[in-house]
Amino acid sequence: RYVMPILHDVTVGLPPINEPNMVALTRGGTEGSDFVAASLPAPDPDISATLVKAHRKAREILSGNPRIKSGWTIACQAFHAMPGCEREMEEYQYPREDYFTEAAAGDDFIGVQAYLRTFIGKDGPVPIPEDAERTLTGWEYFPPALGIAIRHTWNVAKRTPIIVTENGIATADDRRRIDYTFDAIAGMRDAMDDGIDVRGYLHWSLLDNYEWGSFAPTFGLASLGQGHLRTSSEAIPGLAGVNCENGGHVQIEDR
């Protein structure tokens, strides 16, 4: 209600709450540098329910301006079940992700924020293999996570339109940043070709920034050096082959 008077010219999507599942998992705040959400305990059901109520109330208020489109943004993981552990995966995934995705059904859009996959076994998350390629956050390098998350969200949110509100990689190697982003967007394009309504893609992020207590995980398409001087990276010209045309068609040329 307080900010509505300054939103009269807004015509883009607004998320009243960013990553409510992460808010619930951390109970509103936590310390430390553990970048892997799968390592966190299940959220308190009361906190999760309160977040859903707050989201719906915020959307009710925002709907007073018909130009504003609203929906919240979910931290998604491409969950995989180890053989015979499908039930355990569903029980693990539901309170951490699907509960919040279900609550978005019928919204103007739902934001998908995807970077990685997590395997679930009988006792919960399975450690990443020692020989797997990792990013600077310690996550497995897995570009297909975006396409998997888009497809899963489309089904759970009952065909609510999707905006990719975060996707990217923390790396010091711009060649791998280009590879990751090309392959992630290719998965998004395949989902769109299959009829999934994806209305936009936002990369995380343009510039390196302060992530989880450190400047170390460099997500930026452009880097920041000493003295906060902006330095061009190879990633920006390297991604010039990704073209998003009017009508939602995504064309990917040779990288």
Write out the residue ranges for each language-model feature:
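Non-catalytic scaffold segments within catalytic domains of secreted glycoside hydrolases
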Residues: 1-255
